[in-house]
Amino acid sequence: MANCALILKISLAMLAFAANSILCRLALQGGHIDPLSFSSLRLASGALVLSPFLFYHAKTTLSLWRPLSGFYLMVYAVLFSVAYIHLDTGAGALLLFGAVQFAMVIHGLFKGESLSVMRACGLVIALAGIAALLLPGAKAPPLYSALMMIVAGLAWAAYSVRGRAGQAAGASTAANFVLATPMALALSLLFMKQGHYDAAGIALSLLSGAAASAGAYVLWYTLLPSLGSITASTLQLSVPCLAMLGVWYSWMNH
């Protein structure tokens, strides 16, 4: 029964991660919103939805404020959005979670975790997928966008590693969103001349933040203490496939 609950939680988290790729691409592809405004609204709506966790843990809240975690979350969210302007859903997810896989496997090895044959295969597949996208002659995405998505993946890996500390998942995630939001807003204001949005862009941003990000990231922080870095990274390799399946399903129904 416990295993079934764990599998369900992991499945929900991975589906939400894939949904974020799809929602971000939908918002940016049609020019509904600029990436910095998308990131700011995504983080702000997530912070708002998660704020009750901070009140519930008011007595221990101070220890949950970890500025570096908030910074990593902001870097991931902003670069993820900016990169998706010129990347399709599948390629973006592959670059993101391929970088996550690489970084978290390296961290796990340094921490003494073992690399099984299955996990090694996952790492090889991730690196091969990135190489296939970036090698000369391949139908490669713009290098600048690809590099931004890779850095976003490294930031997400760092954010995930810090989540293994095992403190109250809801309050920790809420604090991270609150810390990340003003940093993203500052960037958005800095480039406000390039800013634009319509109703669809705002709706997709809020849906990404309040639903696909807030709840999923709490769930992910709940899972991380029981997962090794290598296992956590391997699980996330399912996200590019789920994202591409979501796009395919949407395309088949239009």
Model-derived segments and spans:
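Glycine-/small-residue-enriched transmembrane alpha-helix faces in small-molecule transporters
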Residues: 1-37, 71, 78-79, 128, ...
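Transmembrane alpha-helical core positions of polytopic small-molecule transporters
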Residues: 17-21, 46, 69-77, 81, ...
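Hydrophobic transmembrane alpha-helices of multi-pass small-molecule transport proteins
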Residues: 50, 73, 115-135, 182-185, ...
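Helix-helix packing/entry segments at the starts of transmembrane helices
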Residues: 78, 92-99, 163-181, 210-249
